[in-house]
Amino acid sequence: MKNTKPFPFPLRPLLLATIAAWSPLTQAQSQAEDAAALPEVVVKESRSVSEKNQLPTTTESITAAKAADTVNAMNVEDTLKYLPNVLVRKRYIGDTQAPMSTRTTGINAGARSLIYADGMLLSALINNNNGNGSPRWFMVAPEEVERIDVLYGPFAAQYPGNSYGAVTEITTRMPDHFEASVKANTAFQDFSQYGTSNTYRAQEFSATLGNRSGDLSWWFSANHLDSYSQPVTYVTAATAPAGSVGGYAAQDRTGKNIVVLGANGLTHTVQDNAKLKLAYDFSPTLTAAYTLGYWQNRADSHGQSYLRNAAGATVYPSGLASNTTEQEQWMQSLSVRSKTQGVFDWEAVVSNFSMSKDLTRTSTGLYPAAQNGGNGTIADAGGTGWNTLDLKGVWRPDGVKGAHIVSFGGHYDQYKLVSPTYLTSNWNAGGNGALSTDSRGKTETSAVWAQDVWRLAQDWKATFGGRYEWWRAFGGYNYAVASGGINQPEVRNSGFSPKLSVAWTPGEQWQFTGSFGKALRFPTVGELYQNVQGSDGIFRQPNPNLQPERVLSSELAIERALDKGKVRVSLFQEDVSNALISQTATLGTVVSSYTQNIDKTRQRGVELVLQKDDALIRGLEINGSLTYVDARILGNSSFVSATSTSVGKRTPYVPEWRATLVGTYRPDDKWAYTLAGRYSGRLYSTVDNNDVNTHTYQGFDSYVVFDARVRYKIDKHWSTAVGIDNITNKDYFLFHPFPQRTLFAELKYDF
């Protein structure tokens, strides 16, 4: 196993500096200096995306300042972990396959929610899985974030039907004056499960630099991450190989006896991210902005055997594999916006995301020889990517406070999949050999939409809207050695999605909002065409005959303002026809994933959210949520079984209960102490709910995880923090083994 000693030399300065910052002498000196040197700081509260665009959606948010106090964050997606009904399936620090689930959608359905950064789409709608369909979170550095808003449900006409889970809008900062920062993070996870016991470290370094000179503002950020993971998968079999001892007796997710023979997916990843943002004010009411982002990843993964022979030598079971990944991805966007706040405003945003290099080399031979080379495959996804164009206008015939505010727009996107896999005689260094499989195709969507916010009376507001979409999949091609090449037929579909929301505000403290929305979620190009083995070892099978999901969503939200807080209760229901649900199956040591249409599912429930500042005592902030969801399969004519049924069973990947609770105590403007808890009920991953055993590889446990963080602002330049995720060292599975107790340390300097 690779050396992952807990305190490598490059981290010693960070750890020493962090310890020094926490010493009483340093604190006393800094307090004296700050009293004389620190100017008064005025914090401007930014508005959410929903408020800016008058969108009729329930929205929960977190600002950069709040995240810095409360969240042990190495990557931007970490900042979402305490928002109501949001779970990012992140298996380890640096995981590039981290889809987001919501109150009605599962953790393996990346295309059922949307993630944007300043209007640039980060959701990889080339697939709907937890692999290459995962959002490109890594294109945003935590240090550039101003705020993150999560909008629940498909009630805004300006978003595609993929919004029926949620829309996450990341707003990043642009400077008004010179500013710069450097930050160092480190983390250590002590992991012990089956025959693997080790400490896995991660370290991150980031820097930002920005300024404004007249009409031009610019921002540059860079980020470097070096991380080691715990096992991602395990090798199992009904019995251990003859002549071997060791292994661990267990049961699979259906309760059958198995032996855990070894671990796979012990991953070392090194990632770099750089981004340049430019904005120019042509006039006080017209601004253009350009963003260019680059990300690269070099990762290698290996296996570990738990078996020995009578002499004590290692026995290597089949199923162990090594792989290396080389990735380079580019994003760019150009936007032009008017901001008169008069009768008419407009904006245009065009973006491109390109996977310029994406090579995964995987061994197929037997260990131990395969660790150093030999037969394998090379999967090449280079050339995959997407383009988007959005046009929007806002008409205010009676001004910003008039009876009508009409917004309308057009949208176009195209997604391209390129995914050949080649055989090679030397998996870690050889060139392409014979073509093994090939998957190609494109999808495109055109749409027009409109929305009218109509103030019926002083305390009544109605929002009417609709979206019409034209979709097609074309250029589909699949190749396999056994069957040869197949050109898939072109597929077209279209439809209208109406939206309606009515809000009643009888006083300053109460608001009642009823919303209804229809959404169409068209199949992704990957669901239709991609046949590939991912870096996680899972084979994903396509289905070119999939139908679009048709979603009817409704919500009644009741919100009451409190003194320095709020409480909200939401009743919601979601009916999905032709639900696209991914299933997994294991044949021998091979795990396969496939997608099928389910006739109808229904998810309905209730959500309670509380936020209160100065709760009980001054300086104590409480945030919490509790959600119950009854998620059921109502029809599934494609399921055939002599022994079981899927109708009436729970919808896969949606838990019955979820809860979060976060308490942050700020005795002054320097210290912030946070204790947080996250709970999720168990999940089912099969349509007939036969995965009765949760605590196993490919099972889905219920879990309660507690985290803590303490942050200290030393002076106007220096800040430091320490924290722990999973304080009680909860051992749990969400298909994969999830991180155990992890320690964090952070040191930051703002110029």
Model-derived features: where do they sit?
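N-terminal periplasmic "start-of-domain" segments of outer-membrane beta-barrel proteins
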Residues: 39-71, 96-99, 127
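Extracytoplasmic beta-strand/coil segments of soluble accessory domains associated
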Residues: 77-124
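Short acidic/polar hinge/loop motifs at secondary-structure boundaries
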Residues: 120-154
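Structural signature of Gram-negative outer-membrane beta-barrels, strongest in the C-terminal barrel
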Residues: 281-283, 403-413, 439-574, 662-668, ...
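Transmembrane beta-barrel wall of Gram-negative outer-membrane proteins
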Residues: 198-300, 328-330, 446, 498
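Gram-negative outer-membrane beta-barrel transporters
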Residues: 183, 457-462, 566, 572-576, ...
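Face-selective signature of the C-terminal outer-membrane beta-barrel domain
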Residues: 279-295, 323-480, 487, 503-505, ...
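Membrane-embedded beta-barrel scaffold of Gram-negative outer-membrane proteins
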Residues: 335-339, 345-361, 503-505, 511-517, ...
